[in-house]
């Protein structure tokens, strides 16, 4: 029995290891039902909504289904007849980054040309009446297979000489950008190294610089329509590279990926010779840059929306990568790219209100898919703790980093707008260390402890006497909190804050988790 148990344990470990290294992952059975075919997937960038074509319709008719998830995928449902009818280009559906807006291709009147691009918005559980994008997006030709960027400000699509319910030919790829007023500019044709005669089904990845498309007019394919990837580098699209890890002798055309960019979802033949949806691990050299979704709300104490500005700054170069406002209900979402560190900031229109800052480090091997941040902006009250996440010090010093200037300016604005308060600058170190030797670069501070002892000795006449001896012990430590607090208050005074309105509080304790060092900086308002 013991040998059998050991064998089972080893078998379990081997299976787990193999699964961890798997290059393919089949979507769950609620989507890949064994009795139906599923094809042409399109997943929202946040990974929580999915469209696909299946023969789950009446009498096995092809239809477009929608599913979503908070944790697990829910039972797919057919799209309403206002969208899902014989007038559509069956595999030309797409979703916005949050899955709340759908773009699709239809020949249902009124249209500008043959097939046009339309959109519909999800309100609760109902899709709104489709709206034609009209000119200049649509033309007298056939437009289809739209693919929006993560920020919704651009749309990639194909314009074709011929199109019907199932197929298209003679296609070129275009990009169209939105004006500040929400209207569309004139579409621009992608360059000749992409448009070689019949390029179709563009899929712009969440990083907005990686484009996957299909073509049967680029040399070196495996047969039929093959998939290619091109990247936008310094304003130019690279020469397309075939996706050999998924291309086959058959038509390979409709694929999709979430913002993390690790896996590509594609239809393939599965059990019982039915088409199913499978995730394929994208090789590192072909993988788009992963994107993390930051979402949440900006409200007051009563959960009402507050007029505010959201900015995201790349801390590597100091450049602002995003600037915008929350929606009318206070909600927001934005995507940030892996590979650098960011400062996320929410600033109110009213100077007397608090503000919010948080730092993101997306330089590690794995990044989270989502960060949810709900911000409450309010007038400071005595005892409130306002985290000063944007204040950073140069390594192993009490010298403020230049990136701290933004946080200091915001703090000065708020303090000047609340003159009835004094503000206590708190600097708290979790991760205090000391040693009798300067054993690391972090141990920049020195403390001397003196110990007085009484020693009895015999003098030259043989008489006993006592004398005091002082022993001095030197310790090196990393508690720079008082110097750091003073550096902050000095900067505030230089910016015009009266020193009488400032206090400091510092403390240093050992790390709660060994090796987990944290420096927490706060501003706490107090009544005068």
Each model region followed by its residue ranges:
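Periplasmic OmpA/Pal-like peptidoglycan-binding modules at the C-termini of bacterial envelope proteins
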Residues: 267-278, 378-382, 421, 435-528
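Short, acidic Ser/Thr/Gly-rich low-complexity loop/linker segments typical of extracellular
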Residues: 315-331
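A short, solvent-exposed beta-strand micro-motif common in secreted/extracellular proteins
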Residues: 330, 340-351
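Structured interaction patches on ligand/partner-binding surfaces of diverse proteins
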Residues: 349-374
């Amino acid at each position: 029995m013991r040998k059998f148990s050991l064998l089972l344990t080893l078998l379990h470990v081997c299976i787990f290891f193999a699964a961890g290294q798997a290059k393919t992952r089949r979507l769950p059975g609620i989507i890949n039902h064994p009795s139906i075919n599923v094809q042409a997937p399109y997943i929202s960038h946040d990974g929580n909504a999915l469209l696909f074509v299946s023969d789950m319709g009446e009498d096995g008719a092809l239809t477009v289904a929608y599913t979503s998830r908070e944790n697990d995928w829910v039972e797919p449902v057919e799209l309403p007849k206002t969208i899902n009818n014989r007038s559509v280009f069956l595999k030309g559906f797409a979703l916005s980054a949050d899955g709340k807006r759908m773009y699709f291709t239809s020949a249902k009147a009124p249209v500008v040309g043959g097939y046009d691009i339309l959109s519909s918005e999800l309100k609760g559980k109902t899709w709104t009446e489709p709206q034609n994008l009209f000119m200049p997006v649509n033309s007298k030709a056939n437009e289809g297979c739209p693919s929006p960027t993560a920020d919704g400000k651009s749309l990639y699509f194909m314009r074709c000489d011929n199109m019907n319910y199932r197929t298209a030919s003679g296609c070129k790829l275009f990009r169209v950008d939105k004006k500040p007023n929400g209207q569309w500019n004139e579409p621009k044709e992608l360059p000749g190294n992409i448009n070689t005669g019949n390029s179709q089904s563009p899929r712009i990845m969440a990083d907005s610089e990686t484009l996957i498309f299909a073509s049967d007019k680029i040399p070196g394919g495996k047969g039929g329509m093959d998939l290619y990837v091109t990247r936008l580098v310094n304003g130019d699209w690279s020469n397309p590279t075939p996706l050999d890890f998924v291309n086959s002798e058959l038509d390979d055309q409709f694929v999709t990926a979430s913002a993390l960019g690790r896996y590509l979802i594609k239809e393939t033949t599965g059990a019982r010779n039915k088409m199913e949806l499978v995730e394929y691990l994208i090789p590192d050299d072909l993988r788009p840059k992963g994107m993390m979704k930051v979402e949440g709300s900006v409200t007051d104490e009563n959960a009402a929306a507050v007029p505010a500005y959201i900015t995201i700054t790349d801390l590597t170069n100091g450049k602002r990568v995003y600037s915008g406002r929350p929606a009318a209900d206070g909600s927001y979402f934005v995507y940030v790219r892996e590979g650098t560190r960011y400062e996320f900031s929410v600033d109110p229109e009213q100077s007397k209100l608090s503000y919010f800052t948080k730092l993101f480090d997306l330089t590690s091997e794995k990044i989270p898919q989502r960060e949810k941040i709900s911000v409450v902006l309010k007038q400071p009250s005595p005892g409130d703790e306002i985290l000063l996440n944007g204040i950073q010090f140069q390594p192993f010093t009490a010298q403020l980093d230049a990136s701290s200037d933004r946080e200091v300016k915001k703090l000065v604005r708020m303090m000047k707008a609340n003159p009835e308060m004094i503000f206590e600058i708190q600097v708290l170190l979790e991760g205090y260390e000391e040693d009798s030797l300067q054993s690391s670069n972090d141990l920049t501070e020195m403390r001397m402890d003196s110990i007085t002892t009484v020693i009895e000795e015999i003098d030259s006449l043989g008489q006993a006497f006592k004398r005091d001896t002082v022993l001095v012990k030197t310790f090196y430590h990393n508690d720079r909190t008082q110097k750091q607090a003073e550096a902050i208050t000095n900067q505030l005074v230089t910016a015009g804050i009266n020193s009488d309105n400032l206090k400091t509080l510092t403390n240093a304790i050992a790390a709660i988790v060994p090796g987990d060092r944290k420096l927490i900086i706060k501003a706490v308002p107090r009544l005068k």
